[in-house]
Amino acid sequence: MSQLTLYHNGPSTCSQKVRLILELKGLEYESKLIDLMSGEQHDSEYIKLNPNHVVPTLVVNENALIESSLINEFLEDAYPEIKARPSNPEKLHQMRLWVKYIDSYHPQCGPLLMVLG
């Protein structure tokens, strides 16, 4: 089984997306909180993992994966036992629209997700 380490921040919308899929799939992972307010995402060791200076980063067997939606796609492909992605083509299209919307507007969606959560 792969060793998963998630570098993330609690209120970060992008981090929430990845944690949601990890929890839905019941995957065990090591949690490493990154303090964005203190600028921890700019530390030289973190930049080696994520040159974009953002969260989340998922390290899988020493390989760093970045970009929350792409991390979730990886998790769906690598751990297919519990499906997060619908198999119905129309529902899959709807899911992809929501992912695109959140990826495009996530700074504005953060407070909305907090209220809905």
Label for each model-derived stretch:
Residues M1-G117:
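GST-like domain detector, emphasizing the conserved glutathione-binding G-site
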